[in-house]
């Protein structure tokens, strides 16, 4: 996984910087996501494994993508095909989105709660997190009844466990030590 991230990072960064320069970040995100979906297709997977010459593979891949990608994105795909890197397209698309969020000073926060939160509670969480992280926060909520009560918030490296299950677990660890 770390190797794929390392391979994908320069492609994502180059694409993002170009998209930013061209003021086309959204369209590039869409093109990369589409190309990533094509690369994950079960019919395309065997071709990406290296059984096809890079020039032919690039031509085939671009043909499948059709008009969904522009000339500059086609150039990126050609370079990736020449280097045998089309298989990392999903990671490139994911890192592109991360760069996009970082640039926009946005962060995605996972909120896991024991019960469904009200809109007022979600608003309060959003405001608090935005203040603490100095970024715009997008909340993704889910319910896990095993928490008993409370919430677990994960935003980037930050993890706040305010659940009863977490408190019981920490208390148990303290008593055992």
Swiss-Prot record:
<dbReference type="GO" id="GO:0046933">
    <property type="term" value="F:proton-transporting ATP synthase activity, rotational mechanism"/>
</dbReference>
<comment type="subunit">
    <text>F-type ATPases have 2 components, F(1) - the catalytic core - and F(0) - the membrane proton channel. F(1) has five subunits: alpha(3), beta(3), gamma(1), delta(1), epsilon(1). F(0) has three main subunits: a(1), b(2) and c(10-14). The alpha and beta chains form an alternating ring which encloses part of the gamma chain. F(1) is attached to F(0) by a central stalk formed by the gamma and epsilon chains, while a peripheral stalk is formed by the delta and b chains.</text>
</comment>
<dbReference type="GO" id="GO:0045259">
    <property type="term" value="C:proton-transporting ATP synthase complex"/>
</dbReference>
<keyword id="KW-0997">Cell inner membrane</keyword>
<comment type="function">
    <text>F(1)F(0) ATP synthase produces ATP from ADP in the presence of a proton or sodium gradient. F-type ATPases consist of two structural domains, F(1) containing the extramembraneous catalytic core and F(0) containing the membrane proton channel, linked together by a central stalk and a peripheral stalk. During catalysis, ATP synthesis in the catalytic domain of F(1) is coupled via a rotary mechanism of the central stalk subunits to proton translocation.</text>
</comment>
<keyword id="KW-0472">Membrane</keyword>
<dbReference type="InterPro" id="IPR026015">
    <property type="entry name" value="ATP_synth_OSCP/delta_N_sf"/>
</dbReference>
<keyword id="KW-0066">ATP synthesis</keyword>
<dbReference type="GO" id="GO:0005886">
    <property type="term" value="C:plasma membrane"/>
</dbReference>
<comment type="function">
    <text>This protein is part of the stalk that links CF(0) to CF(1). It either transmits conformational changes from CF(0) to CF(1) or is implicated in proton conduction.</text>
</comment>
<keyword id="KW-0813">Transport</keyword>
<protein>
    <recommendedName>
        <fullName>ATP synthase subunit delta</fullName>
    </recommendedName>
</protein>
<keyword id="KW-0375">Hydrogen ion transport</keyword>
<dbReference type="InterPro" id="IPR000711">
    <property type="entry name" value="ATPase_OSCP/dsu"/>
</dbReference>
<dbReference type="Pfam" id="PF00213">
    <property type="entry name" value="OSCP"/>
</dbReference>
<keyword id="KW-1003">Cell membrane</keyword>
<keyword id="KW-0139">CF(1)</keyword>
<comment type="similarity">
    <text>Belongs to the ATPase delta chain family.</text>
</comment>
<keyword id="KW-0406">Ion transport</keyword>
């Amino acid at each position: 996984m770390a190797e794929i991230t390392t391979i994908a990072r320069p492609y994502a960064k180059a694409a993002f910087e170009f998209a930013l320069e061209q003021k086309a970040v959204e369209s590039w995100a869409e093109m990369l996501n589409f190309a990533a979906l094509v690369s994950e297709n079960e019919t395309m997977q065997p071709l990406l494994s290296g059984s096809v010459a890079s020039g032919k593979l690039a031509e085939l891949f671009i043909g499948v993508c059709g008009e969904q990608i522009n000339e500059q994105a086609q150039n990126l795909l050609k370079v990736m095909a020449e280097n045998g890197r089309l298989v990392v397209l999903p990671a490139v698309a994911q890192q592109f989105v991360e760069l996009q969020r970082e640039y926009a000073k946005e962060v995605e926060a996972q909120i896991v709660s024991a019960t469904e939160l009200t809109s007022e509670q979600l608003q309060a969480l959003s405001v608090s997190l935005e203040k603490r992280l100095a970024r715009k926060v997008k909340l993704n909520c889910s319910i896990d009844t095993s928490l008993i009560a409370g919430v677990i918030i994960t935003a980037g490296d930050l993890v706040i466990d305010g659940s009863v299950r977490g408190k019981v677990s920490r208390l148990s660890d303290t008593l055992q030590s």
